[in-house]
């Protein structure tokens, strides 16, 4: 036990929850962001009104003015975190327009804006996730320099099975089933794939959902990889197009949970005794472009500890809700970054939080 404790104390990577005191974080970069080539796996994940935009502009850069505005907000976000005492690291921008591939397919890239999706930190283990989108196949390349540094510093560096992403991984001829009562997922169980953003950490317990990028095979692989110290609980929500859990259910602190009232209509039994804070209805105007998400991206907040929380500056209802629940909102403009498919949690992966492995569920 003494050896384990020493390893944890010296590892540069160590994080067990979404709320322990944040000491180090990676903030993404939006430079060079490209619109991914259209693929059937994207259809159930993207807003219907954006499908034609992606089809018409596949492989092209995102509008430069959008990139510039988002970069400005990201840099300010990083500055705010540093002012709050957090060490901020950034990935290396990569040329997303380069063509790459594997047997049977080719693609260009997308961006390195959302480290939350591609890297999962559980304890002292930083895991590269086997992503389901072909356009994200080499996305972790932007983080390799940091990953090597963390490994040399004592962290455990793991990687999920590198997927083939052949046609067998996707439902042939997928179409929306209007009569379905549960999500009609576009990925199969051919091989394990998962995005880190379909998991949220509560010490010894990890909440997960199956989605259009995360399959049961991937969840089972992760559970076996993590071993008996952790238990993954797979929950199903009232979401017909699941992709990433942070706009559905967000642990804020021990015993406090932010929930999407449209998707979480009944409190999961494992959260018995927890306080449920209903996320206020988003107020983002319809005129603001959201290429990849719904307006519920307003739930994608970031806890710096059990009290401080980063919230979008213009989201007055969320600011009020956080204050009412006893939290201290730290405000940051982020709507232009929201256009690219994420907010504060998506734009980051916490590398080190000051805490220990505990159980918080009944």
Curated annotation (Swiss-Prot):
This is L-arginine:L-lysine amidinotransferase. Disruption phenotype: Mutant loses the ability to synthesize homoarginine and phaseolotoxin under permissive conditions. It comes from Pseudomonas savastanoi pv. phaseolicola (Pseudomonas syringae pv. phaseolicola). Involved in the biosynthesis of phaseolotoxin, a nonhost-specific toxin which is a key component in the development of the halo blight disease of beans. Catalyzes the transfer of an amidino group from arginine to lysine to produce one molecule of homoarginine and one molecule of ornithine, both being precursors in the biosynthesis of phaseolotoxin. Can also use L-canavanine as an alternative amidine donor with L-ornithine as amidine acceptor. It is an enzyme of class 2 (transferase). Changing residue 240 to P: No change in activity and substrate specificity. The active site is at residues 195, 244, 346. Disulfide bonds: none annotated. It catalyses: L-lysine + L-arginine = L-homoarginine + L-ornithine; L-canavanine + L-ornithine = L-canaline + L-arginine + H(+). Transmembrane segments: none annotated. It comes from the Bacteria. InterPro entries: AmidinoTrfase. GO terms for biological process: creatine biosynthetic process. One of its GO terms (molecular function) is glycine amidinotransferase activity.
